[in-house]
UniProtKB/Swiss-Prot annotation:
Domain of life of the source: Eukaryota
GO CC entries: mitochondrion; peroxisome
Purpose: Isomerization of 3-trans,5-cis-dienoyl-CoA to 2-trans,4-trans-dienoyl-CoA.
Signal peptide segment: none
Membership in a protein family: Belongs to the enoyl-CoA hydratase/isomerase family.
Single GO biological process annotation from the record: fatty acid beta-oxidation
Name of the protein: Delta(3,5)-Delta(2,4)-dienoyl-CoA isomerase, mitochondrial
InterPro entries: ClpP/crotonase-like_dom_sf (IPR029045), Ech1-like (IPR045002), Enoyl-CoA_hyd/isom_CS (IPR018376), Enoyl-CoA_hydra/iso (IPR001753), Enoyl-CoA_hydra_C (IPR014748)
EC number: 5.3.3.-
GO molecular-function terms, A-Z: delta(3,5)-delta(2,4)-dienoyl-CoA isomerase activity
Site (Important for catalytic activity): E165, D173
Enzyme kind, highest EC tier: isomerase
Organism this protein belongs to: Dictyostelium discoideum
Length: 293
């Protein structure tokens, strides 16, 4: 029953969201490098987010997960920045609800919508393929929700970050508050979340929100693509299992993590990819990996 989400932490089902005509997102695949670029492609709207955006995001990450020719994902935005966050003009009617139904029904509909949006961005974290966020210009509100779900974050020197929801009298509800303390530390996370202030690229780097800052957008793209390629050239079986192991470590003890990785290596250590790594090393050629989780 849909109402059961009130009483459980279960992620809402998104299996019915299959979209073929994307308007907010573009997936650029390169079968020779095994790197895909997921592009927020509405620059005139500052790549802002609304209900249709989140539905597309669910569908496109299902496509990424199920495509064995994608080993690493780059997430980036077209135009002047990554995203300005929520499109408040389009979201406002969804929040105020339908005057022809009861307030309790409007509240339930809003709850379901928020849970679906949460599941949308959580697709990044749950996808076994690593995602690298390349951030330039504005990364506001929902943009921070999105990048904190990514595995690696890089930015250019013009990047600006804000948990802007606070200034709009909204609690950030799509993942930032659950993830950012683990990235930047509790004290600075609280400073950002309680003030809603902007921070620049250098501050983001100093507090580990991003790994590296590059002088301009072109350098960011070039270096981000090099990093993605270096990941995609490794065994996809090992890369994907490593990501899942790191995710598991976020909320389990060291002993639980060690037991899990022992089981994984007992199952996968003698893989075809291991044999291919050894063979290609002695033959002095690039390995040709075929295994995926």
């Amino acid at each position: 029953m849909e109402g059961s989400l009130f009483f459980t932490n279960a992620t809402p089902s998104t299996s019915i969201l299959k979209i073929t005509d994307y308007k907010y997102l573009r997936l650029e695949k390169n079968d020779s490098t095994f790197v895909a670029e997921l592009v927020l492609c509405r620059p005139k709207q500052y790549n802002s987010m609304d209900d249709d955006f989140y539905n597309e995001f669910i569908s496109i990450y299902d496509e990424i997960q199920n495509d064995s020719k994608i080993r690493c994902v780059i997430l980036r935005g077209e135009g002047k920045g990554l995203t300005a966050g929520l499109n408040l003009g389009k979201i406002a009617p969804l929040i105020t609800g339908d005057s022809e139904v009861s307030q309790s029904q409007n509240n339930l509909d809003l709850f379901k919508m928020i849970r679906r949006w949460q599941a949308s961005l959580d697709k990044i974290n749950k996808c076994s393929k690593p995602t690298i966020a390349l951030i330039h210009g504005a990364c506001i509100g929902g943009g921070v929700d999105m990048i904190t779900a990514c595995d690696i974050r890089l930015c250019s020197s013009d990047a600006k970050f804000s948990i802007r929801e606070t200034k709009l009298s909204i609690i950030a509800d799509l993942g930032t508050l659950q993830r950012i303390s683990k990235i930047v530390g509790s004290g600075f996370a609280r400073e950002l979340a309680l003030t809603g202030k902007d921070i620049d690229a250098k501050t983001a780097e100093r507090f580990n929100l991003v790994n590296h800052v590059y002088p301009d957008h072109d350098t960011l793209l070039s270096e981000g693509r090099k990093l993605a390629l270096s990941i995609a050239q490794n065994s996809p079986l090992v890369v994907q299992a490593t990501k899942l192991t790191l995710n598991h470590a976020d909320d389990h003890t060291i002993d639980e993590g060690l037991y899990r990785v022992a089981l994984q290596n007992a199952a996968f250590l003698k893989s075809d990819d291991l044999n291919e790594s050894a063979t290609s090393f002695f033959e002095k050629r690039q390995p040709i990996f075929k295994c995926n989780l």
